[in-house]
């Protein structure tokens, strides 16, 4: 594993628990299609606060989960050390998007504010519904409306009025009571 400067790495998933005794690990992908995580290579793992490159040896589906075999990780003990480690890729491997299109990983972590200025919470994940993507927004601890989570459709211009990735803010035309 080689060290990599941190400035251009974006998290695209996370290694999960071990699978079997030969070094396989479950994987959690934050790409829109789970297997799309394999389109972006090379991978970097965040180990002790630093990104280190790693080579993917193999992957496959197992019981509706994706499991991976990383080069040099050949037993359960070595794999256990990597459990819950973030997977990143260099931003340069992502294609440029058109105006109004965003990568999910850019939206996750953004603060959502409605037009009345009420902070509705933070985007924790994205959901695909078939008709449109949905922002899953974890409400603030002491939400005035008693909400723990909000599901807000990502309809650009209709609901989502502005996305500012510099300040990590999404402005929405959405009632805080929903």
UniProtKB/Swiss-Prot annotation:
Keyword Chaperone carried by entry: yes
Keyword field: Chaperone, Cytoplasm, Ribosome biogenesis, rRNA processing
Matching InterPro entries: PRC_barrel-like_sf, PRC_RimM, RimM, RimM_N, RimM_N_sf, Transl_B-barrel_sf
Main location: cytoplasm
MF term (GO), any: ribosome binding
Compartments where found: Cytoplasm
Single GO cellular component term: ribosome
GO biological process, one term: ribosomal small subunit biogenesis
Pfam families: PRC_RimM, RimM
PRC barrel domain segment(s): 99-178
Entry note about domains: The PRC barrel domain binds ribosomal protein uS19.
General function of this protein: An accessory protein needed during the final step in the assembly of 30S ribosomal subunit, possibly for assembly of the head region. Essential for efficient processing of 16S rRNA. May be needed both before and after RbfA during the maturation of 16S rRNA. It has affinity for free ribosomal 30S subunits but not for 70S ribosomes.
Family: Belongs to the RimM family.
Record text on subunit structure and interactions: Binds ribosomal protein uS19.
Protein name: Ribosome maturation factor RimM
């Amino acid at each position: 594993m080689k060290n990599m400067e941190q400035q251009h790495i974006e998290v695209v998933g996370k290694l999960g628990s071990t699978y079997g005794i030969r070094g396989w690990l479950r994987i959690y992908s934050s790409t829109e299609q789970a297997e799309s995580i394999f389109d972006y290579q090379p991978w970097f793992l965040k180990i002790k606060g630093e990104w280190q490159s790693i080579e993917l040896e193999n992957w496959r589906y197992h019981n509706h989960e994706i499991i991976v075999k990383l080069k040099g990780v050949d037993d359960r003990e070595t794999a256990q050390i990597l459990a819950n480690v973030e997977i990143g890729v260099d931003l340069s491997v992502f294609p440029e998007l058109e105006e109004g299109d965003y990568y999910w990983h850019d939206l996750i972590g953004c603060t959502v504010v409605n037009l009345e200025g009420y902070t509705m919470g933070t985007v924790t994940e994205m959901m695909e519904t078939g008709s449109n993507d949905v922002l899953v927004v974890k409400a603030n601890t002491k939400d005035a409306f008693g909400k723990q989570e909000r599901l807000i459709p990502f309809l650009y211009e209709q609901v989502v009025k502005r996305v500012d990735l510099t300040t990590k803010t999404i402005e929405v035309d959405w009632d805080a009571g929903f």
